[in-house]
UniProtKB/Swiss-Prot annotation:
GO CC entries: extracellular region
Assigned keywords, A-Z: Amidation, Cleavage on pair of basic residues, Disulfide bond, Hormone, Secreted, Signal
InterPro entries in UniProt: Adrenomedullin-reg_peptide
Basic residues: bias regions: 78-89
Gene Ontology biological process terms in this record: adenylate cyclase-activating G protein-coupled receptor signaling pathway; positive regulation of heart rate; regulation of systemic arterial blood pressure; regulation of urine volume
Chain segments carrying region Disordered: 61-108
Disulfide bonds: C38-C43
Tissue: Expressed abundantly in the spleen and thymus. Also expressed in adrenal and pituitary. Not expressed in brain, heart, kidney, liver and stomach.
Name of the featured protein: ADM5
Amino acid sequence: MTAHILLLWLFASSILGDPDSAGRLTRHQVSLKSGRLCSLGTCQTHRLPEIIYWLRSASTKELSGKAGRKPQDPYSYGRRRRRRRRRREARLLRRLQDPSLRRAQLAG
């Protein structure tokens, strides 16, 4: 499906051509236009295998094990960090609330 759309786009752009190519261009205008596509569509047809390869590889990309976790997973990166921070905060709160630990901290 994507290849058909790509081929139709290439065909349409080669038929329509570049709208700015109707008149003569100065050197400055030519240097500015060097990054654009060719008016006859030859650049697109030469790059067609490269474009098709890129589209194919993008659609068949293998997922890595790191990215495959569900967002609800309790061991995902953000939840793991938040849980660790909560544990630290709870431990600090217990130290502050426990009088024996507070005296030991003040003495040391």
